[in-house]
Every structure is written in C-alpha cells, then in structure tokens.
C-alpha cells in the first residue's frame, strides 16, 4: 500500500497542478468489517490532460479511433512516455497496476477526466458523460491480499 500511495502522491504533486504552488489532494481510509478501503483524490488536471504524446502516437491513435479508456489503460501499461520526458520515468502508474495485478490490493478503480477504469473488471471501464477535474483512486486491502503479499517471491 505504501508504494502505491507514494506513487499517487508523487504524481499528484508533480503533475496535477504544474502551474500552481498549492497542491491539493485528499487521502482517506475507511475500516470495514473484513477490509480496509482507501481513496486518494487530487484536484489537478487529470492523467489524460497531462499526457504528452509523441506525434507518431497522436497519429496512430487518431487513425485507429482509439478512445480515452484505451489510452488511459495504455498509460498504466507504460505505452506512453512520461510528461517529464525523462528516460528513467514512467514507472509509477505501471507499478500501481502491477500491485493490483499481483492482487496485493483488490478492486482498484480510477476516475480521471472522462474515464472510469476498473482494473478488477475491465468490462466495467467506460467513458463518462461528465469530466472529473483531477484523479480519483479507490482500492481495498483484505486479509487475502495481505497474505498474498506476505507469501510473495522476493
């Protein structure tokens, strides 16, 4: 959980409000009977709005009619370069997806710009009618996910 929160906060601070001095984000934890629910929200520009695409990527996306859901999913799959253009960057969002894929957390969901991305059930992912200015993350930690993390191969 720590590495996910660290990546989310770092992205929020570095990218959410690049032209502002104040960085606004909210982290919340809810303790349920058999799980802990986490949310992280920033009120920046949103992941898709801060994405820098190369001209080739823009052209390929345009001719293939690639929608925002696939683009956002591609960002988490490291298909686009970091907006900082540093070669050693673009590891944070793929790391968040990897933590969910390894099932160290469960039910990861992201809302940003006009996209709802459900990593646990991709069929639920969709383009939204209204734009969220910023990024919202939701995930759960259960006994099963903790046990999975404790027995991982290091």
Where are the predicted features?
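Short coil/turn segments at secondary-structure boundaries
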Residues: 52-53, 152
